[in-house]
């Protein structure tokens, strides 16, 4: 399936994000729901939708490492750690970095760290580039339901009027692997 968004669809998604609302979009394995990481209003809407406590923290998904720099502190990374991370990106591996002190608690939760990923999904890259920043990203599913893998499944769980960027997932069966950026410790198998 062609994942190149027509400019009208990108413009609509960006408008929804700018209005502090949540959108759904395909990622490497499943559909995600996301919003503007700098909007507490939008993040609280997402957390309420997912019935997820703010203390758990969230993941940011980005088109490039540059988009993530305002949120994370990569100064403690050695050259070999940096090389290990960049060898996985862009791709379906999420790394937990120390957060910058100014990174909002609505993103980090009870942690002093933040999980981030540079995606290789062309549609998400285009969306993040058009919006000019990363998106909060978590699986598109209601509590107790399986993650959505199609636009139809998103509409079945969230309603027909829920804003969805239509497209195909990347075909992976498992969600992204999650690792500690400093130690390489595996938190979740991908």
Curated annotation (Swiss-Prot):
Keyword set includes ATP-binding: yes
Entry EC no(s): 2.7.7.87
UniProt record, GO biological process: regulation of translational fidelity; tRNA threonylcarbamoyladenosine modification
Any one of the GO CC terms: cytoplasm
Keywords: ATP-binding, Cytoplasm, Nucleotide-binding, Nucleotidyltransferase, Transferase, tRNA processing
This protein's record includes keyword Manganese: no
GO molecular function terms listed in the Swiss-Prot or TrEMBL record: ATP binding; double-stranded RNA binding; L-threonylcarbamoyladenylate synthase; tRNA binding
Recorded catalytic activity of this chain's protein: L-threonine + hydrogencarbonate + ATP = L-threonylcarbamoyladenylate + diphosphate + H2O
InterPro entries, per database record: DHBP_synth_RibB-like_a/b_dom, Sua5-like_dom, TC-AMP_synthase, TC-AMP_synthase_SUA5
Subcellular location(s) per record: Cytoplasm
Domain YrdC-like: 7-190
Reported function: Required for the formation of a threonylcarbamoyl group on adenosine at position 37 (t(6)A37) in tRNAs that read codons beginning with adenine. Catalyzes the conversion of L-threonine, HCO(3)(-)/CO(2) and ATP to give threonylcarbamoyl-AMP (TC-AMP) as the acyladenylate intermediate, with the release of diphosphate.
Family classification: Belongs to the SUA5 family. TsaC subfamily.
UniProt protein name: Threonylcarbamoyl-AMP synthase
Organism the protein comes from: Klebsiella pneumoniae subsp. pneumoniae (strain ATCC 700721 / MGH 78578)
Name of the coding gene: tsaC
